[in-house]
Amino acid sequence: MDSFELVVDAISFAYGKGQPNIFSELSFSVKAGDALALLGRNGVGKSTLLSCLMCFNHVQKGHIYCNGVDLISASIKERAKLIAFVPQIIGADIAYTVRDYTSFGATLRTGMFSSPSKEELEKTDAIMEMLGITALRHKPCRDLSGGQRQLVAIGCALLQDTRLLLMDEPTSALDIRNQVIVLETIEQLRAQGYAIIFTTHLPEQALLLNSRVGLCRGGSIDFYDSVSDVTLEALEAVYKTKLSLFYSDTVNRTVCVIPQLGQKGM
């Protein structure tokens, strides 16, 4: 894949005039092959930041550049060629088949009511094969498990043919097996050169992916180039809870973060 960079330049956002900023003067960047995990408690602005990057929410200050294109002033169609969004999970009542829903991602680049071309349908089939959902191609999405629906949502985003994927709590409400499937897919995409930003409440998911980390405190984000640079004290300050880290000699790194019981927080 070619070179790629997202640059977030001193953005500030509040939900209304006179309201406190969710974040202020926030700057960071991600490049091809980066996975950035945004960690933090509920309500600290993780999902809000993704919404600002997608321009669903409009920042009051700053700029967001994707390969030199200012996303804030770009058209919806221009943004759809640069950045793709994977929601927490697609609706359980979606009647589209897996193949139809996955191929919908291609129409976001060309027009909401356009039909996918033969080439785009061939790419749909290739992406379903990569994600291991080919056998489900004729099945309605509403009949899928949560993990299967999440893979379909990732497939739809990949059909946009962008270099940047934003994933909001991609493993929320999934059992352990399906969490592993989704996390392995994220790692596979990162290795292929995609830039990925995902939100999570769970530090161990960043540990598994050995990703970059942004600790969201509410109003600010502390960035680390490696999850190994994040200290126990920093995690406890973010989650306001005493934690225990478990180290694995097999992989030579911390693999699990568990809260200590018997305390109501710091």
Identify what each model region corresponds to.
Residues 165-169:
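Catalytic Walker B motif of ABC-type/P-loop ATPase nucleotide-binding domains
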Residues 232-233, 238-266:
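ABC ATPase nucleotide-binding domains
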Residues 54:
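Helix-to-loop junction immediately C-terminal to a conserved catalytic motif
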Residues 140-144:
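Conserved ABC ATPase signature
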Residues 62-70, 79:
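Conserved ABC transporter NBD signature motif
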Residues 39-41:
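The feature captures the beta-strand-to-loop junction immediately N-terminal to the Walker
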Residues 103, 118-136:
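Conserved ABC ATPase "signature" region
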